[in-house]
Regions:
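Outer-membrane beta-barrel translocator/channel fold
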Residues: 88-112, 116, 130-142, 150, ...
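Residues on the lipid-exposed face of transmembrane beta-strands in outer-membrane beta-barrel proteins
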Residues: 60, 71-75, 85, 111-115, ...
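Transmembrane beta-strands of outer-membrane beta-barrel proteins
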Residues: 61-63, 74, 84-88, 128-132, ...
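Gram-negative bacterial Sec-dependent N-terminal signal peptides
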Residues: 1-20, 648
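Transmembrane beta-barrel domains of Gram-negative outer membranes and organellar outer membranes
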Residues: 21-139, 151-155, 221-226, 231, ...
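Short, aliphatic-rich beta-strand segments
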Residues: 58-60, 346-354
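Repeated loop/turn-to-beta-strand initiation elements of outer-membrane beta-barrel proteins
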Residues: 58-59, 79-85, 92, 120-127, ...
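Flexible, glycine-rich linker and terminal segments associated
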Residues: 22-23, 184, 193, 197-201, ...
Length: 740
């Protein structure tokens, strides 16, 4: 019997570590790195610059003044591309009707993009173009083109000058004729309308209407922690949302711009922490901070078992091998668990699940070191097979004689690749001499279910404990189950059970979360049978039936074609599902129309329906899109709407993955509700950059701006693309950041 304590507590802030700067370095010759602005992203105070943050830099920032509280997350995905997600709270405005959102202040969500057009050279500035409040509600929407140029001095620090042109929110001064207006009259006026119910891309407004020239300078003083900023702000604030008084507002706000000159300072309190203070519009003080790290700089620092040194005490023949000891050493030293061992003439084959090392070469070298010491010299080949859910996904053949030369450093710079080769043959042959696999697995882990920026509460969460167990009935058939126990949540802050969001067309496949996650403090999340299979070395399949997730039961199958070593794969799944009754562990809804007595209204659920997709995966090898993954799903969602989901992710040197997805379907914006379509973002962080032990596990933070019912997928327990990752690694790519 095997017990593992699962480690699933999510932590983004574990990455924010560094040594504090010592006092003897702060007066070294000044060096300049771009800093964040109030809106998030690289900029001056309110106005963006042509600068980009270093590739891989992630910033969490906040800025507070009388009119706004802004919370931002920015990421430099590429040297030429930066994205920012922003929450803006407007304290003087009520979110909505009091019976719906109580006294919660107005909350706006926005996304910004910036693209570098020209990299700075000796004579030319760095030039960037960007869009603010992309797909938002239009509170801050605007566009800009900016150029920045640095001036270094020997004794007085670094000056970074910026000159730009803004439209929309950044062009309210209208101090220059819109150059696009001269080319086409449609650019002379900026449309007042915004698409749908928010969330749509209002590209028909871009670069239209009044334009304004802005500028400023950021000054890195000789005292390294201190930098100063001054800018000419071209928003006159006459149309800012807090100034638009309406019945129900908490109080009135005057945002008259007494001067367009804003000044500010930044103090670097720590290598990864900036404190900001600014004086804006001639009468407003703003304060903020930013926390940052760089995902291209997070090295793995382990305390690991030492690799065994070559020993002369090898057994004389195969009959003298202690297979039990060999299994334990393969798990402890090389990370292969549940090992089965076969002997085929002069080849020893081990197959097991790799749980420690993302770098397969480290796993192979450590396995070879163990096998070399515990097998007789008559063995010529070590075959190492990595399995996931008993599916073979990767194999390597290690020449025992060549490895002997590597282990004894018989030549300059020996490497495990000198003795090993990737094998397409993952079949097990010969006589089985040991079976270390465990049929029963069980574990307990903490869980955190959270939602940020809902209309009735900024942060809604559910903290609990999840117990899970699985049992292999055969080598291919697994029974599994999980039970969730709530410890604490703040769902009672919700003022409804069925959200009064105005939607009636799609069934409530995801927006009934409170009924499942709060009203049932102890619940069965999953109970299912799963059959795993593979055909040849490229085709994988799973079939499953039961209670598939917390909200749906059903039966389904998934197929995946994934050639080993290739940068693409094709898959498909089809599922017949029914929505589970939240008031019963084993029941499902029998009728489409239901009634909520607490809310006094009817609503629709999915009593029976199909969902499934054809999926394509592609990892391009283009230099300007290196280390990225595109995934496209085409099919039918849970709400029976039909459409396509696109998912794009970028992996940094440390293995941290940042991605975004969007689901488009045949639901109109009005049928979908606020947000217009489902969209989300996620960060996946390898445990081995946050802990001192090697691990292939990951912590994932997934965020959807709004949870609506359209464009939602089934949350299957197993995903074949993840299970077969070793066939062409994505999630288990090695950390390439040099050790400190």
């Amino acid at each position: 019997m095997m017990f593992r304590q699962s480690m699933l507590t999510l932590s983004l802030f574990a990455a924010f570590y560094a040594n504090a700067e010592s006092s003897d370095t702060v007066f070294q010759p000044a060096s300049y790195t771009p800093s964040q602005m109030d809106f998030g992203g690289v900029g001056l105070i309110k106005m963006p610059t042509g600068r980009m943050a270093p590739e891989g830099e992630f910033n969490l920032s906040a800025n507070i003044n009388h009119e706004y509280r802004m919370y931002n997350a920015s990421i430099a995905l590429f040297p030429w591309f930066e994205a920012t997600i922003r929450y803006a709270i407007v304290p003087n405005k009520r979110m909505g009707a009091q019976e719906f959102s109580g006294d919660s202040p107005y909350l706006d969500k926005g996304i910004d993009f910036k693209f570098r057009l020209l990299e700075e050279s000796r004579w030319l500035p760095e030039v960037a173009v960007g869009v603010r409040d992309f797909g938002g509600t239009g509170l801050f929407d605007g566009e800009f083109i900016a150029a920045s140029k640095k001036l270094y001095t020997n004794d007085y620090g670094v000056f970074d000058f910026t000159l730009g042109m803004g439209w929309g929110y950044m062009g309210m001064h209208g101090n220059v004729t819109n150059p696009f207006c001269k080319a086409n009259d449609k650019f002379c006026e900026r449309p007042k309308d915004f698409g749908g119910t928010g969330g749509e891309v209002d590209y028909h407004r871009w670069f239209k209407g009044p334009a304004a020239i802005y500028g400023g300078v950021e000054y890195q003083t000789p005292y390294q922690p201190l930098r100063l900023k001054v800018e000419y702000d071209t928003n006159d604030y006459s149309e800012d949302f807090p100034t638009r008084f309406r019945p129900g507002d908490f109080y009135e706000v005057d945002m008259t711009q007494h001067t367009p000159i804003n000044v500010g300072l930044i103090y670097r309190a720590h290598r990864n922490i900036d404190l900001r203070l600014s004086y804006e519009r001639g009468d407003t003080v703003s304060a903020g901070f930013s926390l940052r790290t760089n995902y291209n700089e997070l090295a793995s620092q382990w305390r690991d078992e030492p690799t065994p040194r070559p020993s002369n005490e090898q057994p004389e023949n195969i009959n003298e091998v202690d297979w039990q000891s060999l299994e334990k050493q393969l798990a402890l030293v090389a990370g292969y668990e549940g090992v089965k061992i076969h002997v085929d003439d002069t080849t020893v084959i081990i197959s097991g699940e790799q749980v420690k090392y993302r770098d397969s070469e480290i796993a192979h070298e450590r396995a070879a070191a163990v096998l070399r010491n515990q097998l007789p010299k008559s063995i010529n080949t070590y075959k190492v097979i990595n399995t996931q859910q008993h599916i073979a996904t990767e194999a390597a053949d290690i020449d025992a004689k060549e490895y002997e030369r590597v282990a004894n450093v018989s030549y300059i710079k020996p490497h495990i690749s000198d003795a090993s080769s990737v094998s397409k043959d993952t079949k097990v042959r010969g006589q089985q001499v040991h079976d270390g696999s465990e049929r029963l697995y069980y574990g307990v882990s903490p869980t955190l279910r959270q939602s940020i920026a809902e209309p009735e509460e900024f942060y809604i969460f559910n903290l609990g404990v999840r117990g899970e167990a699985s049992y292999w009935l055969t080598n291919q058939l697994q029974a599994s189950s999980s039970i969730q126990v709530n410890i604490y949540d703040n769902y009672p802050e919700l003022n409804f059970i069925v959200p009064p969001d105005g939607t009636t067309v799609p069934p409530r496949v995801r927006s009934l979360g409170r009924m499942y996650f709060h009203d049932n403090p102890v619940r069965m999340d999953t109970l299912q049978l799963t059959w795993f299979d593979n055909f040849g070395d490229s085709i994988y399949q799973q079939t499953y039936a039961g209670y598939l997730e917390s909200m749906f039961a059903g039966v389904g199958t998934e197929w995946l074609y994934r050639p080993r070593g290739k940068n693409w794969a094709i898959g498909a799944d089809i599922n017949l599902v029914a929505q589970r009754d939240p008031d019963s562990w084993f029941g499902v809804y029998q009728q489409e129309t239901q009634y909520s007595a607490a809310d006094g209204r009817s609503f629709k659920v999915l009593d029976k329906g199909y969902t499934g997709f054809v999926s394509g995966y592609y990892m391009p090898k283009w230099s300007w899109l290196d280390d990225t993954l595109f995934k496209i799903d085409v099919g039918q969602y849970l709400a029976q709407d039909v459409g396509v989901r696109g998912d794009f992710s970028k992996q940094f040197k440390s293995g941290v993955i940042v991605g975004a997805y969007a689901s488009l379907s045949n639901l109109s914006s009005e049928e979908f509700g606020e947000g217009s379509f489902t969209k989300g973002f996620y960060i996946s962080i390898p445990f081995d950059v946050m802990t001192v032990k090697p691990s292939r596990n990951r912590a994932k933070f997934d965020w959807q701006p709004l949870t609506r019912d359209g464009g939602q997928k089934l949350n299957k327990e197993h995903d074949l693309f993840s299970l077969t990752d070793s066939a062409s690694p994505w999630f288990t790519r090695k950390n390439t950041v040099p050790q400190p």
